[in-house]
Amino acid sequence: MVDRRAEVVGRLKVLEESAAPLISFLQNPALVQELRSDQQYNLQMLQERYQIGSDQIEALYQYAKFQFECGNYSGASDYLYQYRTLCTNSERSISALWGKLACEILMQNWDVATEEVNRLKETIDSKSFASPLSQLQQRTWLMHWSLFIFFNHDNGKNGIIDLFFSERYLNAIQTNAHHLLRYLVTAVIVNKRRRNVIKELIKVIQQERYTYSDPVTEFLECLYVNYDFEGAQQKLRECEEVIVSDFFLGKQLSENGFVTIPLRDEFMENARLFIFETYCRIHQCIDIGMLSQKLNMNYDDAARWIANLIRNARLDAKIDSKMGTVVMGTQSPNIYEQIIEKTKVLGQRSYALTSNLILTSAAVTASAAQ
Amino acid sequence: MASRFWTQNSDSESEEEEVSDLEDDIPLGGEGGGALPSKYLQGDSDSDESDDQGPRMVRSAKDKRFDELVQTTEQMKNYMKINDWVQLQESFERLNKQLEKVNRVTESVTAPRIYIKALVMLEDFLNATLVNKDAKKKMSPSNAKSLNYMKQKLKKNNKLFEADIEKFRANPESEVEDEIDEDDEDAESADGFSDDDIVERTMNSDEEDEEQEDDGGGWTSAEKKPKEMFPKMDPGQISWEMVDKKLKEIIVARGRKGTDRAEQVEQLSYLARCAKTPAQKLEVMVHVVSAQFDVNPSLNTHMPIAVWKKCVQNVLVILDILAQYPNIKMDETSEPEAENETEKGADYEGSIHVWGNMVAFLERIDDELFKSLQCIDPHTKDYVERLRDEPLFMTLAQNVQAYVERLGDMRAAARVALRRVEHVYYKPQEVYEAMRKLSELQSRVGGAAAEIVAGEDGEEKDGEAVMKASTETKGPAPFVLTPEIVPRRPSFPSVNRKLMDQLVTLIYKHGDERTRARAMLCDIYQHAISDEFYTARDLLLMSHLQESVMNMDISTQILFNRAMAQLGLCAFRESLVTEAHNCLSELYAGGRVKELLAQGVSQSRYHEKNPEQEKLERRRQMPFHMHINLELLEAVHLITAMLLEVPNMASSVHDMKRKMISKPFRRLLDINEKQMFTGPPENVRDHVMAATRALSKGDWKKAVEVIQSMDVWRLLGQRESIMEMLQEKLQEEALRTYIFTYSPYFESLSLDQLMVMFGLPEAQVHSIVSKMMIAEELHASWDQPTRCVVTHNMEPTRLQALASQFAEKLNVLVESNEKAFDARTGGGGLEGLGRRNKEGQDYADAAGGRRGGDFGGNRSGFRNNRGGRGGRDNQAGGRGARDNQGGFNNYNRGNQGRSGYNSGYQSTRYQDAYSSAGRTPYQAGPASGINNRGVQQADAGGRMVSLSRVGSNRF
């Protein structure tokens, strides 16, 4: 251990020394001001005025890496930031970006980390990699790392949907990392405003079913593909376990001694809503007693819950309290309306056509007359 | 005795082939003890005429040739009597020509007895004439000239047949007495040899020598011919220069009109034995192989099997040499005549270049094997025998691949690997196992035989030949001994998947585009027959082959079709009905399955094919053992079509615009319905039609019964599970059909009743009905407390449906009016009209596929049909978009660079699929379908606007 320590310290010394000129330069804010956006100029200037060449810059990178390995993340993050402004090697600059992201995640600076993710994403997308394969790998890595951020950041649920649903990343999930579907599905279920993507998500889930399925994806499948409500209930219970045991999803929050798992509660609530909504869509008449059972509520709660839904205009239904049922309103397109809709524009179009025709013939006769 | 002979003879004459078989043996049949084939033949032909064998006058070509020989000999006798040397000279020349012909027909090199007899006669007469000086003086000048000419000619000629002549002189009369006995023996011995043996022996004079000598030693004949190349010389004295000179001579003669190809092979193989240095031997061997390829000049027929085998052995020898002397390089670039490099001996260190291309040889050998399998009738034993040669080829390919890899030529290695893949890919595990066992068995037998003779004979021979070879070799021993270095048995991994993976990975890494594409298709095929549908499908989609295959050569397209067919069967086995139908529907769309799969030619009524095309087509045919069973394929296609189409038809009784899923199926159904009487089902189609009728009434039990009674199912492996799957699918579809058809007439349907009617569990019925509700196919909803479906009776009445249709037609009418107007005023004439027409259609498509039933129905139906091909294609679109935009497609075998596929290929084939997206559950990428549609709509819309603007601006 002592040997190891000596070794580490020795290495630290060496690296520090080699990177010293640059670090001292960078630590002087006045001097940093002199740096401009033009990289070539910067390099030249450093070379001429401070004798800082590519060796030192390289040393800075190594130094930052070493700092990172030693656990000094903020230092590493700073150095890497500086390094990037000076770096010419694109491979290295990507490594630096990754390093920076790692630092931010480890320091739990979620906002900064989000920025880093976006920056990295841009680089990956814009850069023409030697092989598509490595690009794919980079993307996959990015998605994995971003999980740390998305499930800790406030706006993470939106972010994850945005990132994962963007075409290329969805492809990457499908080809390389099916297990990420779980997080995507969870995020979609929890996120009320992003209902529209659910159809697409189901397609993806179905497509990849043969390689990957877990209770969370199966839940959606039961609900939207098989319309198997019993199965959905069953899966929902399994989901709960999965969420609790999952590192990202089951993050615990302790408040006043109570340990809560916010995501689980949110998930369960939304999932219940999903089930109910779908159920209502295909039923005309539902027994509240049965419903309350399915929703794990007592009768009154269920009735109140439904009434709330109706009041919020999320549901076109009425409660028949005498029979203890919910009666759905049906809306179906009227055939007459349909036909009227179809033929409405025809007259207009024909009229326009005739008038055009007359104009043309007039023009033709006019030109003939001339 | 005699009767036996005659009966045998008559048997053989009744069957042409056997005649030739027997006749083949005749010159050789004498091995037993100086038989006289000529007499035998004479007797033979006599018997045809004199004996009462019936009115048969069928005579083989050989008979005729022999007759000619006999005739000429007779003529010569006459000329001798009148001492006419001019005529005699002519006859002699004719005789020689005829001899050649005879030999070619019988594929032998020995001269027939009668020829020798003629020679002897001639010689005697010549000598007599020369002695008689008076007579000589009396001759006319032309006669004397001829005499001199004959003197020289005969001397030269007789040298060739010296041994024969001597033998003949030894017992000139024997034939007369023993004729019948001999003939009998002939016939018997002829029976003893198979055709192959004979041809093989005749093909290689070396072995022939040995065999004949040990067979009793008497019968030596014209096959000494090659030795004539170095007359009167002990083989040991032949120098490098001589061999080289001779080789060049032979090569120059190659391809000339008069050159006998078979003879060339002999000469060359003799040269190979005489070769002085390994490099020279190699050089000669290369020429031997190419000469062997030349033996069969026609593209349509295959190389004789014996030659093929010899050829394989020769190539193996070449490989041996190459392995033994790594300093010898073989390439195509080196100038064959550049320098006398081959003179350098075995101990020479530097590199020696020899012209030649192993891979080309291998490919040619493979082609010949393929061709022979095409030609041989698959129901004969020959075919099976021929199939047994496959391991031999695999050995060779393996060795060649090893050699090329040693050279570091990975591209060539990929080519060889592809050949190997193409021999393995269509084999299911069981067949593969059989092949492996066979090859092990063969090598064991071969190995044992090799051990027996190993001590005495260092030469290269295949097992069979070795066993027959004599213990003493009197033929000239080869100067360059080449020990067997390369393994003579193929090493097969125990699982064919392993072999495939190994080879395919190599190809993906190093092959060119075509090789890779073919390997990929083989890989897909292999996955499909081993029931790995998803792997196969992903491979297909990620490689984008379905887009680029249109640009490839025909045989690759056939391979693609085969792979698709297997994929369809595989999907069916995995009970993925839609996928199966999508895979197969395209094959059946044109009704030319046989041609598409290259499993026979279908007669087309509409256009006659010219012989050229037919020949080409025949050349493309798959050998029988690679066939995909067409009946099974048709059954699967029709059943999947039925499962999809019947509910579809039921759901769209009123509106015509609904797309058809399977056009061929509909057509069949129409034909079937027009029939006045329908008998009990006989073939696949009848069965499916009967099932369709039952299914459309919701009678699933009958449908299941009919379908399960088909006999094609015995071709399927897991029959039980597939039958179960079919039953379940039929039940489901029957339920859907029933609901579609009869729901308008019900106020409510009880869940329990449905369960009982269709024998399905509650959850499934509930799920199916719910699905229909959500998809708005069924206007109804569940009434949970009473467990029944309450229909809303939203189905329009007939009048309403007609009104709706009418409205749509009006729409189309207006649209076409507008188009006509635009075409007139917009300028651009017909072309513009066509173009705009197309755009208009796209627009209509994009706007929701709203198109009239009859108006332009043909075309729109077609488009709809194609567009609606559904899942697979759209999915392809989805995945395609995903990869195209991502700019990468990895398949984790590490085959990068395949991205070459996805750029630049504008596939017309799947355009429709792209534009009709959003209908199927597959749409992977959001951009592919929905955006596409949006864009198109906007685009088309924009154009419409601009058109009308043009119209109005004009005034």
Which residues does each predicted region cover?
Chain A
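Charged, E/D/K/R/S-rich low-complexity terminal regions of large eukaryotic assembly subunits
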Residues: 1-94, 98-370
